[in-house]
Amino acid sequence: MSLEIVILAAGQGTRMRSALPKVLHPVAGNSMLGHVIHSARQLDPQRIHVVIGHGADVVRERLAADDLNFVLQDKQLGTGHATAQAVPFITADTVLILYGDVPLIEVETLQRLLKHVVPGQMGLLTVELDDPTGYGRIVRNADGKVAAIVEHKDASEAQRAITEGNTGILAVPANKLADWMSRLSNNNAQGEYYLTDVIEMAVSDGLLVATEQPHDPMEVQGANDRKQLAELERHYQLREGRRLMAQGVTLRDPARFDVRGEVSVGRDVLIDINVILEGRVIIEDDVVIGPNCVIKDSTLRKGAVIKANSHIDGAVMGEGSDAGPFARLRPGTVMGARAHVGNFVELKNAKMGDDAKAGHLAYLGDAVIGARSNIGAGAITCNYDGANKYQTTIGEDVFIGSNNSLIAPVTIGDGSNTAAGSTINQDVDKSQLAVARARQRNIDGWKRPVKIKKT
């Protein structure tokens, strides 16, 4: 069975009160439409058609990809009209219709739905709701089979009492969809072309409308305003928290934890409160992450420890290494096994060897630091001359004294020491002591200046 997917994403979202198209509003660091596209791709379709309207150029620019065919709906005349715009481009046997503002739909739910597309049958995703206000109602016949969908505004009082709602997500034979689109009418309270009308057409044509339901009603929840967007965000985060806990992670408080990307985890990981994981994050066994940390596009090897209020971005922390509190690792940083970065230390594009240490108050940019070397408090690699950046190379077993300025490009040989307060702008050979500071003078009879009174 060949598959193509149509995602309806043309709505304006006036209740968002935003210049940003509704489907581009973020949930967990990705746009709502981005989440839907991600789920769609996991179904391995031939092609994905995205129907766009309001803010079409912005949507196309943000999400352009080779497997996406953007189809313009000039006038927003309903979901049926939107779907019809994509029909001429469809060549597959089966079509799955999704919505760009329904980001939490699970791939497993869609796989179950697609299994219903067999000869003489189509699939419809419905949902049982305590309060179905606003949803189209699933009308069934005396045999319990789906007969039609009636939109809320067109429903009678008896029909509004039905608690089974239409999600709008359906899977249909492509040839049937093309026929149904040509027969749609806008003779209804809204004056729009409803996609839901195809259900009655399918029944009339003798097709069985088989239904599936999501395991969680929030899977099919859309967002029309900021409140609903926040509800989706919180539900997504709790869902991700449950997934990670099932894989061996202890979350101190799942309600105070955010995932904004893709995270893979090992066992016996401990994550404290107010931790944010962004982008692609790999966390191996026995990692401990303290409170109030942000970790982005990074790898944390087995047993790594991140202490409170640290920011890790584009870095690799080696096995048994630790950083923080208040540490910052910037892109390109690699810490070796058991390396230590303490409070108020910043590394950028720096390589630290095994057991190397920078305990506090240091900036190490564009640097290579050998194994077992120690960086004193207040040490800085002066890597930028206003136009270009240069590397500082520190060998193994080096001791860099406190308050050192290392003016790159410069190399400090293995086993060397630099004295506190030094400004090092020349290479230091192996096992040397470098002292580069003015000689102290003690001046007798010196008088402290007296403050001049203002007139």
From Swiss-Prot:
Its cofactor is Mg(2+). InterPro entries: Bifunctional_GlmU, GlmU-like, GlmU_C_LbH, Hexapep, MobA-like_NTP_Trfase, Nucleotide-diphossugar_trans, Trimer_LpxA-like_sf. Residues 248-455 are annotated as: N-acetyltransferase. The keyword Magnesium applies. Acetyl-CoA binds at A377, N383, Y384, S402, A420, R437. UDP-N-acetyl-alpha-D-glucosamine binds at residues 8-11, 22, 73, 78-79, 99-101, 136, 151, 166, 224, 330, 348, 363, 374. Its EC number is 2.7.7.23, 2.3.1.157. SUPFAM superfamilies: Nucleotide-diphospho-sugar transferases, Trimeric LpxA-like enzymes. It catalyses: alpha-D-glucosamine 1-phosphate + acetyl-CoA = N-acetyl-alpha-D-glucosamine 1-phosphate + CoA + H(+); N-acetyl-alpha-D-glucosamine 1-phosphate + UTP + H(+) = UDP-N-acetyl-alpha-D-glucosamine + diphosphate. One of its GO terms (cellular component) is cytoplasm. Residues 1-226 are annotated as: Pyrophosphorylase. The active site is at H360. Pfam families: Hexapep (PF00132), NTP_transf_3 (PF12804). Binds 1 Mg(2+) ion per subunit. Pathway: Nucleotide-sugar biosynthesis; UDP-N-acetyl-alpha-D-glucosamine biosynthesis; N-acetyl-alpha-D-glucosamine 1-phosphate from alpha-D-glucosamine 6-phosphate (route II): step 2/2; Nucleotide-sugar biosynthesis; UDP-N-acetyl-alpha-D-glucosamine biosynthesis; UDP-N-acetyl-alpha-D-glucosamine from N-acetyl-alpha-D-glucosamine 1-phosphate: step 1/1; Bacterial outer membrane biogenesis; LPS lipid A biosynthesis. One of its GO terms (biological process) is lipid A biosynthetic process. One of its GO terms (molecular function) is UDP-N-acetylglucosamine diphosphorylase activity. Keywords: Acyltransferase, Cell shape, Cell wall biogenesis/degradation, Cytoplasm, Magnesium, Metal-binding, Multifunctional enzyme, Nucleotidyltransferase, Peptidoglycan synthesis, Repeat, Transferase. Mg(2+) binds at D101, N224. Its main location: cytoplasm. Residues 227-247 are annotated as: Linker. In the N-terminal section; belongs to the N-acetylglucosamine-1-phosphate uridyltransferase family. In the C-terminal section; belongs to the transferase hexapeptide repeat family. Homotrimer. Catalyzes the last two sequential reactions in the de novo biosynthetic pathway for UDP-N-acetylglucosamine (UDP-GlcNAc). The C-terminal domain catalyzes the transfer of acetyl group from acetyl coenzyme A to glucosamine-1-phosphate (GlcN-1-P) to produce N-acetylglucosamine-1-phosphate (GlcNAc-1-P), which is converted into UDP-GlcNAc by the transfer of uridine 5-monophosphate (from uridine 5-triphosphate), a reaction catalyzed by the N-terminal domain. This is Bifunctional protein GlmU. It comes from Pseudomonas fluorescens (strain SBW25). The gene is glmU.
